[in-house]
């Protein structure tokens, strides 16, 4: 299951990657 992190990654990387979020389909998701 993937949970949206409420962040977009169209122009910049996911800042929320520090809490385990990654970019999928231009939106940051937590795996």
From Swiss-Prot:
Q: Which domain of life is it from?
A: Eukaryota
Tissue distribution is: Expressed in seed but not in root nodules.
InterPro entries the UniProt entry points to: Cyclotide, Cyclotide_bracelet_CS, Cyclotide_sf
Q: How is the protein modified post-translationally, according to the record?
A: Contains 3 disulfide bonds. This is a cyclic peptide.
Q: Name one Pfam family in it.
A: Cyclotide
Q: Where is this cross-link: Cyclopeptide (Asp-Asn)?
A: 1-31
Give yes or no: UniProt keyword Disulfide bond. Answer: yes
Q: Which cysteines are joined by disulfide bonds?
A: 5-21, 9-23, 14-28
The answer to whether UniProt assigns keyword ATP-binding to this entry is no
Supply one GO BP term: defense response
| Keywords, ordered alphabetically | Disulfide bond, Knottin, Plant defense
The family database entries (PROSITE patterns) matched by this protein are listed as: CYCLOTIDE, CYCLOTIDE_BRACELET
What protein family is recorded? Belongs to the cyclotide family. Bracelet subfamily.
Question: Regarding domains, what does the record say?
Answer: The presence of a 'disulfide through disulfide knot' structurally defines this protein as a knottin.
| Function summary | Probably participates in a plant defense mechanism. Not active against Gram-negative bacterium E.coli ATCC 700926 or Gram-positive bacterium S.aureus ATCC 12600 up to a concentration of 100 uM under low-salt conditions.
Q: What is this protein called?
A: Cliotide T13
Q: Which organism is it from?
A: Clitoria ternatea (Butterfly pea)
């Amino acid at each position: 299951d993937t949970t949206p992190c409420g962040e977009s990654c169209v122009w910049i990387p996911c800042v929320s990657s520090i809490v385990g979020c990654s970019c999928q389909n231009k939106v940051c998701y937590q795996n």
